[in-house]
């Protein structure tokens, strides 16, 4: 079933404005295309809240199923990029969640009506 992986974060306060801009370019030009190539990934979108592109950032990755997350972590291209990604993030404020799509099949599977 379709799964939505959500990652929230702020960039580190120690980054200059130029470094933040460079990280956005890196995310958009290198990370997002690499993620989109992983089998089972439907899309990746990046959003910013009221944090002036420095904070309240959300990455949404829609996948065919929850196993897509493991495929992301095991993908050689994505793994090469993760070190830089995590270096720029304030991991103390970062969060993640998984959401499964509610479908009639899921409701039937979870209900006693079969």
Regions found by a protein language model. Name each.
Residues 77-83, 89:
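A common structural junction motif
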Residues 1-56, 64-74, 92-114:
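Short S/T/G/P-rich N-terminal loop/turn motif that feeds into the first structured element of a domain
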